[in-house]
Amino acid sequence: MPPKVAPESSDAVSSQEQPQRPPPATPPVPTPPPGRREEVGDRAEDPILQRLESLTALLRSERSAVRVTNASFETGRPALQPTADMRGDVTNMYNRPSTDSLWAVKPKPISNNMATSEDMVKIKVALEGLGVPTEHITGIIYQMCFYCASTSSSSYQDPKGVFEWPGGAIMVDDVMGKVQEIAGIRRVCRLYAPVTWNYMHIHDSPPSDWASMGFAPNVKYAAFDCFDYVENPAAVQPLGGVIPRPTRDEYVAYNAYKLIVLNKANNNDTYGNFSAQITGGRMGPTIEHNFNNANNKKQ
């Protein structure tokens, strides 16, 4: 029978059953991130460097190869917001309009001495009825205005010839007859006076009768019948503008000739009645003007 072993104490058993615990780990020592300056002197230079970089960026933003001078921007500026007592009442006839309200009403050039848009539409429809293709009607109107520049825009003229387009033609009498019936030849020619003016200068083609009308070579284009409407803003404007502008000498020459012609045509206006008892069957006396003292100098 084997010998009995003495029982171990409870403390020894418990010490054998429990595992050995490792010693506590030493906490890691934090290391500074790379590039971090630990010196006090280096940390003091950071604000100065930032200011230097900010100044550099500011100077770069201010430099430019473009510099706007004499700036004045009225169009597109922010609209003012008047106070309630200054907004006015637009329903009151005595309301005082502001500058912005006047600016909102755009001007529309208009002249009662030239053909209106409605007149031109009626002329277009009438010429279509005579057989002129729609796409060539504007060209026919141009031809009529160029024709009248050398003849006359008077309704009493006896026109000759035809106006042509590719594949067709129409008698000048028919075109001018319809234009006179609807709007008047002179009123239509005035509407296209700037276009005719540019056309004559592009082709170096002044009115044919300029010499017989008494115009000097330097003002020969003033013999144009509708010269006084070349700079009218209500007329049809060339795409490139009116070139060249009429000169002062041309205005003087045109108005002088216009006065002479009107006096010659209006000699019967001296009569208050055209009955034979008044006129005696004769034309009125010639209206004369003394131009010698026009410049306030006796000659």
Curated annotation (Swiss-Prot):
Residues 1-46 are annotated as: Disordered. Residues 35-46 have a biased composition (Basic and acidic residues). It is found in: Virion. GO terms for cellular component: helical viral capsid; ribonucleoprotein complex. InterPro entries: Carlavirus_coat_N, Pltvir_coat. Its main location: virion. GO terms for molecular function: structural molecule activity. It comes from the Viruses. Keywords: Capsid protein, Helical capsid protein, Ribonucleoprotein, Virion. Pfam families: Flexi_CP, Flexi_CP_N. Residues 20-34 have a biased composition (Pro residues). Required for genome encapsidation. Forms ribonucleoprotein complexes along with TGB1 helicase and viral RNA. Belongs to the potexviruses coat protein family. This is Capsid protein.
